């Protein structure tokens, strides 16, 4: 059952609202050296085109920190500086970026955290308290180990530090590399704080592994009403992080946008190369943002049965096929004419739906 979203304190990263009633935002992280402004800008452009709302960049040295001023000028997305170990880089970054991410397990003493808070206060930019199971502060790691309890205690401790400094412009993340700890940690912390949550499974693996872990962990939390912004961490292409994240949002009922693809797993009745055709159709129609159920089937049995509730369906037969709109056959065509006709019909349906929404 889809639960109502937990209403959290709203913060802003650039012009993007996080928490409250704001849409759940997606983000990724560049892998270039941040000081290489041209390469980093190119990656941010790719993420923008893929549909990302925010971008995070690594600040590994002073050169990276100083480059943020120029990068901010050319970035099409709000910029988050990711800081580990060296709090002074955060002080430099705060002068240019839209938000700072710190890992309390390695940023240093209370005095160093205060310095970062003061810099963020001055520029009115938020902080993400980024707790990772693998790098908890010594006192929590020794007492609890890399457990949900240890992660939650770290988050509460650091939230209190910021609150005591009269700073509440922050969000929290609790990341582990597996599904169970991730879910348990967020569930445990949610009733204890009002701050927005950034969701993610850290070091989740390649496209296949990460997609499964993230769908289970983040999708489950989203359906429980937990989560305000998210990243799907994938060892691979940047665009895949956004593609998978937006798919998780759609299928967890938190994003009413884009096509819900329905296709059969194939069987002995199949009379066409359905795998290639399904890939071809999805790629050709990937630009459509209108919510539609689109079905690609390998035979008329499934098309007239399982796919009859789709907004539009295509079914392949013996060198011919059907195009079905809202349960009614509208075309019976030779196989060579099916694809282009189907694409046109889906695009026209999307335009009809968009027009009706505006009217």
UniProtKB/Swiss-Prot annotation:
The species is Helicobacter pylori (strain ATCC 700392 / 26695) (Campylobacter pylori)
Task: Enumerate the cofactors the protein uses.
Answer: [4Fe-4S] cluster
Q: What is this protein called?
A: 4-hydroxy-3-methylbut-2-en-1-yl diphosphate synthase (flavodoxin)
* Signal peptide coordinates: none
Residues the record lists as binding [4Fe-4S] cluster: 264, 267, 299, 306
Q: Which UniProt keywords apply?
A: 4Fe-4S, Iron, Iron-sulfur, Isoprene biosynthesis, Metal-binding, Oxidoreductase
One GO molecular function term of this record is: 4 iron, 4 sulfur cluster binding
Under catalytic activity, the entry for this protein gives:
(2E)-4-hydroxy-3-methylbut-2-enyl diphosphate + oxidized [flavodoxin] + H2O + 2 H(+) = 2-C-methyl-D-erythritol 2,4-cyclic diphosphate + reduced [flavodoxin]
Q: Which GO terms describe its biological process?
A: isopentenyl diphosphate biosynthetic process, methylerythritol 4-phosphate pathway; terpenoid biosynthetic process
Top-level division of the source organism's lineage:
Bacteria
Q: Which family does it belong to?
A: Belongs to the IspG family.
Which gene carries the instructions for this protein? ispG
What sort of enzyme, by top EC class, is this?
oxidoreductase
Free-text remark on how the cofactor is bound:
Binds 1 [4Fe-4S] cluster.
The record's annotation in Pfam families points to: GcpE
Q: What does this protein do, in the record's words?
A: Converts 2C-methyl-D-erythritol 2,4-cyclodiphosphate (ME-2,4cPP) into 1-hydroxy-2-methyl-2-(E)-butenyl 4-diphosphate.
EC identifiers of the protein = 1.17.7.3
Q: In which pathway does it act?
A: Isoprenoid biosynthesis; isopentenyl diphosphate biosynthesis via DXP pathway; isopentenyl diphosphate from 1-deoxy-D-xylulose 5-phosphate: step 5/6
């Amino acid at each position: 059952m889809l639960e109502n979203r937990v209403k959290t304190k709203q913060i802003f990263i650039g012009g993007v609202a996080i928490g409250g009633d704001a849409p759940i935002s997606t983000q990724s992280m560049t892998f270039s050296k941040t000081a290489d402004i041209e390469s980093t800008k190119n990656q941010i452009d790719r993420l923008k085109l893929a549909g990302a709302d925010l971008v995070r960049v690594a600040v590994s040295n002073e050169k990276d920190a100083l480059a943020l001023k120029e990068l901010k000028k050319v970035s099409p997305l709000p910029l988050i500086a990711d800081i580990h170990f060296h709090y002074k880089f955060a002080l430099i970054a705060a002068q240019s970026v839209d938000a700072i991410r710190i890992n309390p397990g390695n940023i240093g003493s209370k005095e160093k955290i205060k310095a970062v808070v003061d810099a963020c206060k001055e520029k009115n930019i938020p902080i993400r308290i980024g707790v990772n199971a693998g790098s908890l502060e010594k006192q929590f790691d020794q007492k609890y180990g890399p457990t949900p309890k240890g992660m939650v205690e770290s988050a509460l401790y650091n939230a209190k530090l910021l609150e005591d400094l009269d700073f509440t412009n922050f969000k929290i993340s609790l990341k582990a590399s597996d599904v169970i700890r991730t879910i348990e940690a967020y569930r445990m912390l949610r009733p204890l704080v009002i701050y927005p949550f950034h969701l993610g499974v850290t070091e989740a693996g390649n496209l296949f592994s990460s997609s499964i872990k993230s769908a289970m962990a983040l999708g489950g939390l989203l359906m429980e009403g937990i989560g305000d912004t998210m990243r799907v961490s994938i060892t691979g292409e940047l665009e895949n992080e956004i593609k998978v994240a937006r798919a998780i949002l759609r299928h967890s009922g938190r994003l009413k946008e884009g096509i819900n693809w329905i296709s059969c797993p194939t069987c002995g009745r199949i009379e066409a190369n359905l795998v290639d055709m399904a890939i071809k159709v999805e790629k050709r129609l990937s630009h459509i943002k209108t919510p539609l159920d689109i079905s690609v089937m390998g035979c008329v049995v499934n098309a007239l049965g399982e796919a009859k509730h789709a907004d539009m369906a295509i079914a392949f037969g013996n060198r011919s096929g059907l195009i079905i709109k809202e349960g009614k056959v509208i075309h019976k065509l030779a196989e060579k004419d099916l694809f282009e006709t189907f694409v046109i019909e889906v695009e026209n349906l999307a335009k009809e739906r968009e027009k009706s929404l505006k009217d």
